[in-house]
Amino acid sequence: MTDSSPQSNPNAVPGAADVPAAAEGQQQQEQRRGRGDRDGRRGDRRGGRRGQERDSEWQERVVQIRRVSKTVKGGKKMSFRAIVVVGNEKGQVGVGVGKAGDVIGAVRKGVADGKKHLVKVPLTRHNSIPTLSNGRDGAASVLIRPAAPGTGVIAGGSIRTVLELAGIKNVLAKRLGSKTPLNNARAAMVALSLLRTHKETAKERGISLEQIYS
């Protein structure tokens, strides 16, 4: 007498009814986790691009790198000092100083310091300054005055770097006193910080805007 009951096949693939419910729940969690990881990576890429766009607005130029020393109990400690000018060529500029044991670290610190000391510069339609201004820092003095369209930036050294990164295209500048790059750059920053638009000047003097132009 033959047995008609089906024999079990060890190589047979289990069907959906044979898979426990707990295993199905685990598979669903893994699928959700995979989608979440992909979405997170996609979001990180978007955030990185936005950060790069913000950083690309700023330009930095190294004015000077010097090797300096500090006398300590054990002898002399050598380091580097970098003077960096940071600007977006849209009316914002800053001068920073950074010190570190290597040049790259000093420049990086100088850029961060420059972004902490930004000055907003009022620009005219022709990318010049509205009025004459004079700034001092230590023994350095800088005089800047507006110029006609097509004149360009008539300045030299660190003063020219500050004016160009501020977005000024037509200006005349005169250096008086010390020739130190850091003092001249800071004196130019003081002169730019003292600038006022014609509207602000009229409000401070208590007169109309027409009287300013007359």
UniProtKB/Swiss-Prot annotation:
Residues 58-121 form the S5 DRBM domain. SUPFAM superfamilies: dsRNA-binding domain-like, Ribosomal protein S5 domain 2-like. The N-terminal domain interacts with the head of the 30S subunit; the C-terminal domain interacts with the body and contacts protein S4. The interaction surface between S4 and S5 is involved in control of translational fidelity. One of its GO terms (molecular function) is structural constituent of ribosome. This is Small ribosomal subunit protein uS5. Gene3D superfamilies: 3.30.160.20, 3.30.230.10. Keywords: Ribonucleoprotein, Ribosomal protein, RNA-binding, rRNA-binding. Part of the 30S ribosomal subunit. Contacts proteins S4 and S8. Residues 9-29 have a biased composition (Low complexity). The lineage of its organism: Bacteria, Bacillati, Cyanobacteriota, Cyanophyceae, Synechococcales. Residues 30-60 have a biased composition (Basic and acidic residues). It comes from Synechococcus sp. (strain CC9605). InterPro entries: Ribosomal_Su5_D2-typ_SF, Ribosomal_uS5, Ribosomal_uS5_bac-type, Ribosomal_uS5_C, Ribosomal_uS5_N, Ribosomal_uS5_N_CS, Ribsml_uS5_D2-typ_fold_subgr. GO terms for cellular component: small ribosomal subunit. With S4 and S12 plays an important role in translational accuracy. PANTHER family: MITOCHONDRIAL RIBOSOMAL PROTEIN S5. GO terms for biological process: translation. Pfam families: Ribosomal_S5, Ribosomal_S5_C. Belongs to the universal ribosomal protein uS5 family. Residues 1-61 are annotated as: Disordered.
